[in-house]
Amino acid sequence: MTASTRPTPPKLPRPQPAPLATSPTLDAVHQRLLKHPQLASQLQAQLWQQVTATPLLEADPTQEGKYLVTFLWRGAAQRVLLFVNRLTDEKNLADSYMRRLPGTDTWYLTYRMDADWRASYCFLPALSAAQAPWLQGSQVRLRQALDAGLPDPCNPVTCTNRRGFVQSVVSLPLAPAWPLGDWPVFSDAAAGAGSFDGGGLGAGRGDADAGRLNAGRLDVVADLDTLGRQIWVYTPAPISRTQSYPVLLVLDGEVWLKRHHLHLALAQLMDAGLIAPAYIVFIDSGGTEQRWQELGESNFGRYLTGPLLNWLKTHYAISPKPADRVVIGQSLGALTVLRTLVAYPQLIGAGISQSASLWQDVLFNELNALDATQTPLAGTRAWIEVGSQEWILAPLQPKAVHQLRKAGMQVKDMVYNGGHDYACWRINLASALMQLLPGPNALPGPGAYPAGNLS
């Protein structure tokens, strides 16, 4: 499959424009500058002294429970495009152009958002219209430009996107929270980056220097003859080979391991007793084209339940129970999660699907082929979530959930206020795992999804 032959996600405009608003603070400065342009330098300095953190958050004086979220950028430019995950409409970029305070180099744009919203964002300044990177070339070039924008220098909270670019993150007060506080940040050295691209079973390292009380082990496996790809297997400290343990199968593993150091974040949850100790297997996607080929219409579940699972059973003491085998994926990977549970419920019995690419018909075709009256998916469990800002995917999730439940699957159906966004997915993984593999202390964290029974 090539870029010219693979399926293309629908590119439809937002059904409603993003909720632009007016910040009282910025509007007051703007009006003063119009009346007193000679005070531009003074008023700009006063504004930046007043703004202690960005984006600027103000309670909406007109709508209770809403916030006015003002993004600020300072720098010489003829135009600045603000890219906010799933608020920026690629079919209507003009609505995301920032406004300039007259006579200054300060740019701003305000949205009215509910208090549980989270999103990654970045800035794309252009010194001239001809240099605007978002106006040069195809949809692919546009996507590349948006992904490679600049983070907010005044916001220390960041998230790395799939392509490896650092973006800033805005989280409003009621957004789901990581149970142990802020999302944990580890250095590459602490995460074992020096061994990420090593080879051979046992080419691992401890993570005692990662701020954890106990050390785990990361094995870098390059058994290409058997597995056909590189994988990484993390064994947390509480695990011993004297008994079997659950296993997490993480699709797009190179992103979660190298960009987000997910093994150490989940190890902290295990240490705290929030989720059960489990092996974490990071599965390399093989790159863009291979990912589209395998996680699209191909049957990647056959690989997960065949060569991979058989190899893991030989080398690690993984649980024989399908309920203890959890496959995790996002976007195309999330579609693969659901298809694997449908096709192989006797081998993998639990899954976390985040923003599944349900615009492809393949899952619905497979569900329609089931005899739902026999409840063939009884005993399987899934956490299925989508962002309310995902205007193409969100309307499709209820249909999938209905059909899966009809076939016997226990589904936790969740909608979060956000987009197609690692900044949201990484936080929500904690609640999903507390649901599917709860530890003795599995309680909802501040603002997190409740850890209750599946329905």
Which residues fall in each region the model found?
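Primarily recognizes the serine-hydrolase "nucleophile elbow" in alpha/beta-hydrolase
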Residues: 261, 321-376
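Acidic beta-to-alpha connecting loop that harbors the catalytic carboxylate
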Residues: 76, 128, 254, 387-390, ...
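Active-site nucleophile loop of the alpha/beta-hydrolase fold
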Residues: 253, 285, 352-360, 388-389
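C-terminal catalytic histidine-bearing segment of alpha/beta-hydrolase fold enzymes
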Residues: 383, 392-455
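Cap/lid segment of the alpha/beta-hydrolase catalytic domain
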Residues: 249-317
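Short beta-strand segments enriched for Tyr within beta-sheet-rich domains
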Residues: 117-125, 245, 300, 304, ...
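Short beta-strand element of the alpha/beta-hydrolase
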Residues: 232-235, 242-253
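Aromatic-rich carbohydrate-binding modules that target alpha-glucans
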Residues: 60-116, 126-184, 188-199
